[in-house]
């Protein structure tokens, strides 16, 4: 079984096993390449623009963080509680399952390596109707600086959801 297929199965049946921090989820995403840009679209229903952060790390990794505090799952684990079985302080309600995206505090995180021709410093993002669109223009005839190049033996593109 290929590594990609293994990770797909792990992501579907054991969230967090495929390189994602416990308590975080990956949003569904589309990536299309046009003659002038790479365009990424992610479904983030129920989130406002100020609840989403888009950043480029090390000049070639696009990272999107959305939703609640990223420390919530770690804090619950330290307190000895499962994240889905926390008791609400204000009304004494105990949740046994919280899977709906709208209004939950779980964070959504995804990150992946941008292609060699991506001009990450010129990237733009917009949010409309629960869909985040990130547009990264292509460089004309130029590639990234040598210091940000591919690792030795790494000549295949990396898919958006399976990069560790």
Swiss-Prot record:
Region (Disordered): 68-93
One annotated Gene Ontology cellular component of this protein: cytoplasm
UniProt induction comment: By heat shock.
Name used for this protein in its record: 17.8 kDa heat shock protein
GO biological process: protein complex oligomerization; protein folding; response to heat; response to hydrogen peroxide; response to salt stress
Similarity remark: Belongs to the small heat shock protein (HSP20) family.
Single GO term (MF): unfolded protein binding
Description of how the protein assembles with itself and partners: May form oligomeric structures.
Taxonomy, superkingdom: Eukaryota
sHSP domain residues: 20-154
Localization per Swiss-Prot or TrEMBL: Cytoplasm
InterPro entries, per database record: A-crystallin/Hsp20_dom, HSP20-like_chaperone, Small_HSP
């Amino acid at each position: 079984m290929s590594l990609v297929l293994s990770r797909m199965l792990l992501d579907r049946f054991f969230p967090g096993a495929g390189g994602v921090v416990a308590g975080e989820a990956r949003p569904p995403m589309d990536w299309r390449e046009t003659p002038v840009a790479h365009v990424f679209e992610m479904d983030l229903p129920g989130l406002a623009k100020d609840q989403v952060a888009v950043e480029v790390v090390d000049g070639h990794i696009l990272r999107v963080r959305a939703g609640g505090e990223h420390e919530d799952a770690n804090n619950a684990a330290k307190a000895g509680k499962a994240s889905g079985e926390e008791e609400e302080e204000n009304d004494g309600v105990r949740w046994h399952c919280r899977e709906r995206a709208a209004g939950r505090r779980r964070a959504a995180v995804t990150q992946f390596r941008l292609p060699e021709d991506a001009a990450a410093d010129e990237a733009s993002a917009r949010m409309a109707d629960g869909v985040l669109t990130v547009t990264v223009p292509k460089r004309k005839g130029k590639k990234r600086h040598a210091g940000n190049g591919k690792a030795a033996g790494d000549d295949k593109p990396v898919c958006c959801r399976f990069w560790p």
